[in-house]
Each structure stands twice: as C-alpha cells, then as structure tokens.
C-alpha cells in the first residue's frame, strides 16, 4: 500500500491534467456562448412578421368596413405573428427548462442513434467537441436572456434621439445601447460565469477527463491507486482558487463600469 507522500505527486499531476481540460472547456464555452447569446437575444426580440406589410392597411381600415370584428381580429393576429421570436423563445424555454446533464447526453448520443454513426469521432477530442457544443448552446440561451434584459433596460428615448440625429440601427446599438447594456449585465453575467466553472464537472457524464473525473479515477482504482477518496476532495481547492480569481476580476470590472457611483 502506497503512502500519502508517494501518492501525492501522482495525484497532483493527474489533477493538473484534468484541470487543464476544465479550463479549456470553460474558455471555449465563454468565447462561443457570448456572441451566440447576443445573436439569440436579437432573435428573441425580433419584430419581423411575414404579413407585417399589411399593418398600415389595417390601421387605415374605415370604421364602416364590411369586415366583421372576427375577421379583423384574425387579420391582426396574422399581422402580429412573429415566427422568429416564437421559435427562439421556445428553444430558450426548452434549454432553460431541462438539465444541462441531459442536454450533454442528447448532444453526444442522439446523433449516433439517428445517423447510426459517431459523428464526434473517437477519443477525448470527440468528447470535448460534443461537450463544448452542448455547453455553448446552453449558456448562449442563458446569456441571451441577460442581454435582452440589458438592451431593453436602456431608455427608448436615447434610441429615438439617435434616430433623430440620423444614426442607423447599427450605429445606435454600438454607440448608444452597447456600453449601457454592458454595465447593466455585468452582475448577472458574473453569476453565470461562476456557475459555468462548476458546471464543467457535468461533462464527466460522457467521460470527458476533467478534474472531477480525474479525482474519481483514484477512488475507482483506475489510476494505479485504489480507494483513495482524498484526491476528490482536493479538487475543491482548484475550484475555490479559480472561482476566487474570477470573482476578484469580475468585481474590479464591475467597479470600473460603475461610473454613476460618486
């Protein structure tokens, strides 16, 4: 039976390798989910309607029009039907209403069940790719709701002022809305980022060798050391240090953006 001093170097090296995988998944998710979340937020606020061109006509219908009230109601519903918004919000509802672990299993196994082949490839690279896509899609949906709240929280009068000045919609977003939105979303985004650090451990459900998987391997005896539970507890130190550093960095960013504070 090996002693603690003999086990420690082996465990430390394995946990470092697992933590690097955790870091990779964390940063890949952030890099992918933030821009995708912004795009999804635009979709959830979309005002496009396939029959929107009829809206001015309906507004100008004379009161003595031969259309019945029911026909007018049907027309109004048809004009106000916004398919992009409905589809995007339905997807967000599904993603937010189901566990991330279940989504990981669906992303990894469902394509193989339908296509009868493993589209992710074999080995750790395939599992990492599947995990990354599942995490990006999940967190993009959560981020999109934060972005939507930040955008809609900017007073409409400022956007209207930009239109009066002759600015395009793109110019209004980048020069008027974006900076104010960023300040509003930092606190809720900080919470989601810290949650992401811990959620990366869920990827072990498809055997991605992140840090928790590495710690469990020693308990199961698959790393040459059998029945050692202390490596699993030791993983908490990695999470605490990384979460602490992120909390400090995000706190400084929030203070820097808090320009209303005296």
Give names to the regions the model predicted.
Residues 1-262:
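Transmembrane alpha-helices and adjacent helix-loop boundaries
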């Amino acid at each position: 039976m090996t002693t603690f001093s003999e086990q420690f170097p082996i465990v430390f090296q394995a946990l470092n390798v697992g933590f690097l995988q955790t870091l990779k998944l964390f940063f890949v998710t952030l890099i992918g989910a933030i821009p995708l979340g912004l795009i999804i937020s635009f979709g959830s606020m979309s005002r496009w309607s396939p029959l929107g061109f009829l809206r001015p006509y309906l507004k100008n219908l004379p009161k003595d029009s031969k259309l019945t009230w029911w026909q007018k109601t049907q027309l109004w519903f048809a004009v106000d039907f916004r398919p992009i918004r409905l589809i995007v919000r339905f997807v967000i509802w599904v993603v937010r209403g189901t566990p991330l672990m279940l989504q990981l299993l669906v992303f990894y196994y469902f394509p193989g069940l339908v296509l009868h082949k493993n589209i992710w490839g074999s080995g750790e690279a395939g599992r990492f790719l599947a995990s990354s896509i599942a995490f990006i899609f999940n967190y993009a949906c959560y981020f999109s709701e934060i972005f939507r709240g930040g955008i809609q929280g900017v007073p409409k009068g400022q956007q209207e002022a930009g239109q009066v000045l002759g600015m395009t919609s793109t110019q209004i977003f980048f020069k008027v809305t974006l900076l104010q939105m960023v300040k509003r979303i930092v606190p809720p985004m900080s919470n989601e980022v810290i949650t992401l650090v811990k959620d990366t451990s869920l990827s072990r459900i498809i055997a991605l060798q992140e840090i928790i998987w590495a710690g469990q391997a020693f308990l199961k005896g698959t790393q040459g050391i059998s029945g050692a539970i202390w490596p699993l507890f030791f993983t908490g130190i990695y999470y605490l240090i990384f979460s602490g550093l992120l909390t400090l960095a995000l706190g400084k960013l929030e203070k820097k953006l808090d320009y209303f504070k005296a």
